[in-house]
């Protein structure tokens, strides 16, 4: 597709000519980016994901209609997603936005701003378009969705024009451009998976499901297995499937998730499954070192570069040459160091501290963070260009509370490890499994491991029972590490409000119960109480079960996927809580 410089069109004005509207509150844009990031990381078909993005845009911008159009290799509309019109293919795409408008944005590669569509020839090419409102004046803003200077599609909004109010084009274009950058990476990932035969793009006949094949489903691939990764929940299998695909490439991966979800473990798995598996795997925690030391650790230093530099030393980039480098806690590095790191990532070259010789490095980069980088970018705490450089393939690791069905298998595996290390033969009773399955585990798998080890160490017999757990003896202090507050997410984890930590792995509007939904029904626990920090209340479990069943139309198999359980477990829980299944 040929790119041409932007040219004025009838009824459209260049961005600089339009009066700058009043600045929207930064918090609104941050919240919008945060919600959109949650939608984009959720497992769903591309057209469903894009329709959800438009719905979020509609809730954060005062617009009348919004649309995202994805173009195929020939530049023709392939998918059109709107908030109020079901997503469809090429024929409907031309009806959502005039083809001339799509072509103009794709050809120029620039935003298109039209203060009054009735005065623009671009909007008169097709009679009675669905966005027409008769004599009501409509303004339009559209931006391209780009990736590596290639146009993948467009994002556009329109609103009823109010001559008495300023036209906030500048702010809208900036916000939509940020959204377009996020959307472009999702489109590229879906297309990559499509080429791998994993997930057809735009396929209408398949129901909305994660890309992971369900065990035993006819005509579907069996779940992918990675050594050491335990669990069959849909949330975890989605991650495993994505990891198995991206590992075969050299694409930069951004692992996101709360502390204790296994980011370093998955980074190691990506390396072991990659063509670089026989080369070094080097890791560094960026938050553990001051900026000056961090620069020396990553880039190396020459002899005499600073006090104490008594010999030349290779940095982590050099040590990982030909292999994989994991930068953990990437969100904690300073803005000054971000610029230095960006240069190395862009050029593949570096100089040691105190040196002048340029060294070329070939490294596959994996970054990890539990920080909300979108909010950090909006707050000017994290460089946007570095964010786009490291977030080529973002993978959100689900917290343990989103896959409670995996807790029994995880606990038994951790106990087996403890037994081998200590020459013991301990087992869990059914009551012990029930206690762990009801715990919230804000520290995720790491906290579960600590719980298993502590309980196994103090167990009174070879069979661990419920009374052996610290929470049953008013000795569990985990609740002191988190508390409810007034934040949108409702709790504090790792010292941050949930809304400031990470996008969850599923959108609030999607089929699964996200972290925020679970947390909203959980109250802070008394550290001196008799139960685990959360989810110990039968009332809370019952409410969550009913909510999932209602979302699933009272179909147990669908509710099981929402809760990360098996249909048999859901059926048992329904009987246990004496919930009558509705016949719809």
Curated annotation (Swiss-Prot):
Q: Which residues bind DNA?
A: 556-575
Any single GO BP term: phosphorelay signal transduction system
Renumbered to this chain, region (C-terminal DNA-binding domain) spans: 542-584
- State where ATP binds: 257-264, 320-329
Give start-end of the signal peptide.
none
Any single GO molecular-function term of the entry would be:
ATP binding
Give the matching NCBIfam families. nifA
The name this protein carries in UniProt is: Nif-specific regulatory protein
Source species, please?
Rhizobium etli (strain ATCC 51251 / DSM 11541 / JCM 21823 / NBRC 15573 / CFN 42)
Q: Identify the coding gene.
A: nifA
């Amino acid at each position: 597709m040929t790119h041409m410089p932007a040219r004025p069109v009838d009824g459209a004005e260049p961005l600089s000519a339009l009066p700058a509207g009043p600045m929207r509150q930064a918090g609104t844009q941050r919240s919008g980016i945060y919600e959109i990031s949650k939608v984009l990381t959720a497992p769903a078909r591309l057209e469903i994901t894009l329709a959800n993005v438009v719905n979020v845009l509609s809730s954060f911008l005062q617009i009348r209609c919004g649309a995202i159009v994805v173009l195929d290799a020939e530049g023709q509309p392939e998918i059109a997603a709107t908030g109020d019109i079901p997503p469809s293919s090429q024929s409907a795409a031309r009806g959502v936005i005039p083809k001339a408008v799509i072509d103009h944005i794709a050809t120029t590669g620039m935003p298109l701003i039209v203060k009054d569509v009735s005065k623009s020839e671009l909007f008169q090419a097709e009679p009675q378009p669905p966005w027409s409102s008769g004599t009501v004046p409509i303004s339009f803003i559209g931006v391209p969705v780009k990736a590596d200077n290639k146009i993948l599609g467009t994002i556009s909004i329109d609103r009823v024009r109010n001559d008495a109010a300023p036209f906030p084009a500048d702010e809208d274009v900036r916000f939509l451009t940020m959204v377009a950058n996020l959307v472009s990476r999702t489109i590229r990932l879906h297309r990559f998976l499509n080429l791998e035969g994993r997930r057809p793009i735009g396929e209408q006949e398949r129901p909305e499901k994660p890309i992971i094949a369900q065990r035993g489903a006819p005509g579907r691939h069996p779940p992918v297995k990675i050594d050491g990764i335990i669990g069959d929940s849909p949330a975890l299998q989605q991650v495993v499937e994505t990891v198995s695909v991206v590992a075969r490439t050299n694409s930069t991966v951004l692992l996101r998730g709360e502390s204790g979800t296994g980011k370093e473990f998955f980074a190691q798995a990506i390396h072991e499954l990659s063509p670089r598996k026989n080369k070094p795997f080097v890791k560094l925690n960026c938050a553990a070192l001051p900026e000056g030391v961090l620069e020396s650790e990553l880039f190396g230093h020459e002899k005499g570069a600073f006090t104490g530099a008594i010999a030349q030393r290779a940095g982590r980039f050099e040590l990982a040459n030909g292999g994989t480098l994991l930068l953990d806690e990437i969100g904690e590095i300073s803005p000054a160091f971000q610029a230095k790191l960006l240069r190395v990532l862009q050029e593949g070259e570096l100089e040691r501290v105190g040196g002048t010789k340029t060294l070329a490095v070939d490294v596959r980069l994996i970054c990890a963070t539990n920080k909300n980088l979108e909010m950090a970018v909006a707050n000017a705490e994290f460089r946007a260009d570095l964010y786009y450089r490291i977030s080529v393939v973002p993978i959100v690791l689900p917290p343990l509370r989103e896959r409670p069905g995996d807790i029994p298998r995880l606990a038994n595996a951790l106990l087996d490890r403890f037994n081998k290390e200590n020459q013991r033969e301990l087992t869990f009773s059914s009551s012990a499994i029930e206690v762990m399955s009801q715990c919230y585990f804000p520290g995720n798998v790491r906290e579960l491991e600590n719980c298993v080890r502590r309980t196994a160490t103090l167990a009174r017999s070879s069979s661990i029972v419920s009374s052996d757990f610290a929470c049953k003896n008013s000795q569990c202090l985990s609740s002191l590490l988190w508390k409810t507050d007034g934040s949108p997410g409702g709790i504090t984890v790792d010292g941050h409000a949930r809304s400031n930590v990470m996008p969850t792995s599923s959108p609030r509007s999607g089929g699964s119960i996200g972290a925020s939904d679970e947390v909203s029904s959980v109250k802070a626990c008394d550290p001196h109480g008799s139960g685990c920090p959360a989810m110990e209340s039968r009332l809370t479990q019952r409410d969550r079960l009913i909510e999932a069943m209602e979302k699933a139309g009272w179909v147990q198999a669908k509710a099981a996927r929402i809760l990360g359980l098996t249909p048999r477990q859901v059926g048992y829980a329904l009987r246990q809580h004496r919930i009558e299944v509705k016949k719809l």
